[in-house]
Amino acid sequence: NSSSAATSGNSSSAATSGNSSSAATSGNSSSAATSGDYSTATATGGDCSAQVEGKNSLAIANGAHSKARGVLGCYLVLTEYTDGGKLLCAKIAKVDGTAIKENVWYTLKNGEFEEA
């Protein structure tokens, strides 16, 4: 019941469904999305986005001005870069419904999760 998809190139997208599925993209403005439990969505590149809709899943967005979102119980991994492309920090947070809300886009700003 698992599936995988991978794409590269600016404005690329990958989407999968099924438990333990994975979607990966690279390129500016790329997006990755999964809708199965225990799944992973990974996007890299400036202005990229990752979203997960299954329980116990992981959304990883690595790039300047990247964003991620997920449902309750999922984890979001985000990075923050300088305008010159230097990595400032990487952080992970659990979507708990309070500090990190369900189905809300987040980005890192000054090292903290902030609604995008």
Question: What kind of region is each of these model predictions?
Answer:
Residues 1-116:
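Periodic small-residue-enriched repeat registers in elongated scaffold domains
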